[in-house]
Amino acid sequence: MKLYFNANNKATLEALEQCGVKNVMLSHRYSYANINKFHDRFESIFVVAGTKGDPDKYHEFLKSKKEYYEYATQFDVYYDMDATLKYWRQEKEMGIDWTVPVLQGNYTHHLSQLRPEPNSLVCLGEIKGIAELEDQMRKLPGNLRYHGLAKSKFIKNRIFESVDTAAWISVALAKKSEIWTGS
């Protein structure tokens, strides 16, 4: 399993590099201007559209900086499957056929709309409620690969090929945290 560390500013990127981190996740909002300066410092860069993004700017970034990242999510809208599907289709029409789809809301219904090829990588986005999230994760088909966006809490579930530390960062920024003891 790959763990992608979120790094959305220069200081965090430098600290992660000094710690020997190999995989980073970057928000377009914070990386569009300087991804070419640090792409060779990490083995794998995963780009996400982030919140409050501009779809046109993100799509231009995806096309112009493709050689600097390994993975990039599609432009998605939190909790909104229909809007997320609309952007997925637009990207395909624009020739941006390498983005990783992001499931929002009802994962299985969203998958039925996408119809990804077996062994495709798919990101799990937002669902309201932890019970619903856990139920939806149990129903996921086994013929796909999954990245858990801010789903590192479920690292033991073993359904994910990769997860990221977005949830860790948001907790740290909120100045509220719990210490995980591994039990």
Regions found by a protein language model. Give the residues of each.
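Non-catalytic, usually N-terminal nucleic-acid engagement modules in DNA/RNA processing proteins
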Residues: 1-89, 174-183
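Structural preference for beta-strand elements that scaffold enzyme active sites
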Residues: 2-4, 21-25, 41-46, 69-73, ...
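Conserved, mostly hydrophobic/aromatic
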Residues: 16, 48, 100-101, 158
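Alpha-helix-loop-beta-strand connector modules within alpha/beta enzyme cores
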Residues: 38-48, 89-96, 132-154
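Catalytic cores of alpha/beta
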Residues: 60-63, 109-114, 142-144, 151-165
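Alpha/beta enzyme core
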Residues: 67, 94, 106, 111-119
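Distinct, well-ordered alpha-helical segments
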Residues: 83-88, 108-116, 132-138
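Glycine-rich phosphate-binding active-site loops on the catalytic face of alpha/beta enzymes
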Residues: 126-128, 133, 151-153, 157-183
